[in-house]
């Protein structure tokens, strides 16, 4: 797959909601192609998402920060 198109990644876990209004979902994805194939990373996703969905990532190096619980 060309780098211009992105890298497919499968959603394997939904971690939780984030963002000021809860409109962003943090998920763990397993990268399916490219040099990071098989790597599991955490990403933020806007819009509806379910376990098993395939996301196309523009790049696979950045990882979202862990959601911290409020006290």
UniProtKB/Swiss-Prot annotation:
Signal peptide stretch: none
Cellular component GO terms, alphabetical: cytosolic small ribosomal subunit
Record bears the keyword Iron: no
Swiss-Prot/TrEMBL keywords: Ribonucleoprotein, Ribosomal protein
InterPro entries according to UniProt: NA-bd_OB-fold (IPR012340), Ribosomal_eS28 (IPR000289), Ribosomal_eS28_CS (IPR028626)
GO terms of biological process kind: maturation of SSU-rRNA; ribosomal small subunit assembly; translation
Superkingdom of the organism of origin: Archaea
Molecular function as annotated in GO: structural constituent of ribosome
Family listed: Belongs to the eukaryotic ribosomal protein eS28 family.
SUBUNIT field: Part of the 30S ribosomal subunit.
HAMAP family named in the record: Ribosomal_eS28 (MF_00292)
Protein name per UniProt: Small ribosomal subunit protein eS28
Species per Swiss-Prot/TrEMBL record: Pyrococcus furiosus (strain ATCC 43587 / DSM 3638 / JCM 8422 / Vc1)
């Amino acid at each position: 797959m060309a780098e211009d198109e992105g890298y497919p990644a499968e959603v394997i876990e939904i971690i939780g909601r984030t963002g000021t209004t809860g409109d962003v979902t943090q998920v763990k994805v397993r990268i399916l192609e490219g040099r990071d194939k098989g790597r599991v990373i955490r990403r933020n996703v806007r819009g509806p998402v379910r376990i098993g969905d395939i996301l196309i990532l523009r790049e696979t190096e950045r990882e979202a920060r862990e959601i911290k619980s409020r006290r």
